[in-house]
Amino acid sequence: MDMLNIKINGREYRVPKGSTVLDAAKSAGIDIPTLCYLKDINEIGACRICLVEVQEMRGPVLGPARMVTACVYPVTEGMSIVTNSEKIKQSRKLNLELLLSNHNKECLSCQRSTTCELQKLCLDYGVEENHFTGRKTATDIDDSSVSIIRDNSKCILCRRCVAACKNMQDIGVIGAVNRGFDTVIGTTFDKDLALTTCVNCGQCIVACPTGALHERDDTDKVFKALDDKSKHVFICAAPSVRAQIGECFGYEPGTDCEGKMVAALKRLGFEGVYDMNLTADLTIVEEATELIDRIKNGGTLPMITSCSPGWIKYCEHYFPEMTENLSTCKSPQQMFGAVIKTYFAEKMGYDPKDIVFVSAIPCTAKKFEVGRPNQSAAGVPDVDIAVTTREVGRMIERAGINFKSLPDEKFDSPFDVSSGAGVIFGATGGVMEAALRYAAEIILGKKLEKVDFTEVRGTEPIKFATYDLDGTKVKVAVASGTKNAKKLLNGIKSGEYEAQFIEIMACPGGCVNGGGQPYQPAAVKNSVDLRAVRAKVLYNDDASRDLRKSQENSGVKKLYDEFLGAPGSHKAHEVLHTSYIKRGM
């Protein structure tokens, strides 16, 4: 690798050719603040918070000092860089003041207060008052979506959301509109977000450094239900929530807080706190049964997983001709609600109309999913309210519960049994691996000793694997992120790729990187692979369990014995399966 000799703040360093000033400073252990920069996603130098002074060689001597944006400016041989002079600090402060001059400063009531990157930089640089007054850009609030709220009065035009939607997800429903001072981030033809092909994945939210984008807050609905003594209010927690909820309370990413999460939810007053891993296991049994039936009886292949509502809506918009390939299984969230309002309601003597079922999930698209058609096994919606990991964190704080001081507690019976296969649903490749653990045993007709299908693990955008099961070859593929889903499906259609079973998640890395997960600043996201760190919690949990196959879950067996009959039965299809819409563009 070619190396360059440079100086940073008077010290000599050697850095790889092609490095930016920001890369070089980071390798030297020097932090340069950024605001618009997201590594590999948004590298445009727009906010100018990362200003530094550089001198470049002009023949045998250094040229004059000038200011450049560190995030995009490449280093050159002999370059001298100054990262924190008084002139630089004042320039950064001035840029922050200019941003604030056109910004809604209702910080006390903003969802992003204390996690806002603009707020932190203003504190760091001593921005105490606004020296610039005058006209502000005309903005409005788009609250048409059931998942995502857009408030352009808090937008700083960093374009991180635009890059996440276009560059990372290859959807591009939002972009810069108008020119000059009137520029805002908007949709094509200024449509309401709900009327676009937005898939509600929420990657724009986790990319946003301010409160310009956030999930629709449904915490008041939950508290209202909890206060209604005529209602039976239950909650279930998705696999990945336990691996991220601690981040809301200062724990390092990658900390498993399942026990404290359960304890906190119980103290909020839910009648039952249940583990969604159980219906992840149930999903696997139904989905693998469906796959085997399609393979044996000439059904539509490849079959594609249906757990991710963002992916489902993407398919309905962009690949409507492939909706027949989708598994008809409801997601684990919807299956749980269906089981609660049919089997459990009957067992307890509850009227389904008196049950409020809440799901704690990492996903903003789940808010859209609860209102989808054909998701009402008992004649009422399977799930009433979906709250993100962030909303759960806010509910716990609002209730005055000291999360860190809580003891570890267990999920409530009878929905407390789950396998490691259900746990790994939260990571890309997890659904595929869980399904293979079941399908392989059915095809082989014997107990599977090796349950780790490591070929489908990892954060690579697209993964392929072929398994030879006593002469039966099963070809599988895994993709996460809609951009990668598009590439995979186009390859399947053209014949470039071949697979019988495909797992697709809308969010890159899967649910652990969902749009409803705790905020992490760009400084963390640019240096830590949060997807891998969070997924490791789930894989460690799986590896530590004796029960690692969905089909061996006693809770799932009991559901079939007492209520559903057999996997793929008529009753199972009535309660656990759904249909899709060809939305088109």
Kindly give the residue locations of the regions a language model identified.
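Iron-sulfur-associated redox domains of electron-transfer enzymes in respiratory
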Residues: 4-5, 12, 17-78, 82-84, ...
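A short, structure-level motif marking secondary-structure boundaries and short turns
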Residues: 5-8, 137, 146-148, 188-190, ...
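Conserved functional loop/turn residues at catalytic and ligand-binding sites
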Residues: 29, 159, 202, 212, ...
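Fe-S ferredoxin-like electron-transfer domains
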Residues: 48-200, 213-232
